[in-house]
């Protein structure tokens, strides 16, 4: 990897995809289909898990070893995912608590609530702040029932704005909103970018992460980066295009810079999306191979992607947003259990998980 790089995964999860965790019938199955479809379609050979071995309850320990032993990550933000197609939201509060209590040197956490139920959302946020000491809030743009989908918008003064204000009052720094990739047969309306504008303008002291930024709506995302200094791009899933469709990843990055300027590179954050996908392949490709082609640089006026820029994207941007220091964090994890295991050599993909031996 790049010398002296401190790698941060801006959004990791440990999903429970078991059928007995379904809460919304066909919509639950559709969300799981979307996850496994992304996993299989964006993973290289040797990193693909068959559906029957994939749709289970992934433990926090598995996510941790995939990141810190099987891959070269140093730190991660573990999200509570409020996807109410699952009884526990998909990635439970309990797993986030485990991350904070068991490996505080390796994890921060984001709380997660469903804004469609405003009073419950506010109460749950306060409870999670007390329990988890989160630094941010994870949101999804729609909610599910057994037979319907209900969406909401980031610029809604009655649903969204009171939640953002409460997050600020509770000391949270960031709101991460899932965009661009629809979860199942749901209206695309709520996955578009337009509603972020008013939220970013109304809450300049909150940082808004566009999760899956650039996977769709590249120009809209870029213009938000250009206009709002508190809008950031979280590359979860988008990063995996680097391996599966490198030309598409190049176009995403070029589009963000072309419309937002080189300053956008200070607000793009690396993320793997583990456990949906294995975190190692896109990281390795980005470090070793990502560069704009000479033709594209000349045609679009793009900069060379230096090691310094890669260090920012891979970790320093996230750390700056949250007021963290890479050197201090690196000292905190020296000689911990993951560092010891990694020093023995990198295991094969999924060798430290219950999916050992099933990668295709």
Give short role names for the model-derived ranges:
Residues 11, 68, 76, 109, ...:
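Divalent metal-coordination and catalytic microenvironments
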Residues 23-28, 94-95, 193, 227, ...:
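Glycine-rich, phosphate-binding/catalytic loops in enzymes
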Residues 74-182, 187-190:
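Active-site gating/metal-coordination segments in enzymes
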Residues 31, 135-136, 149-270, 275, ...:
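Catalytic pocket-lining loop regions of alpha/beta-barrel enzymes
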Residues 58-64, 91-97, 121-125, 193-196, ...:
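Alpha-helical scaffolding within the catalytic cores
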Residues 18-24, 90, 122-124, 149-152, ...:
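Short aromatic-enriched loop/helix-cap "lid" or pocket-rim segments at secondary-structure transitions
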Residues 1-10, 17-66, 262-267, 277-360:
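Mid-to-C-terminal alpha-helical segments outside catalytic/metal-binding sites
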Residues 11-17, 178, 212:
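Histidine-centered divalent metal-coordination motifs
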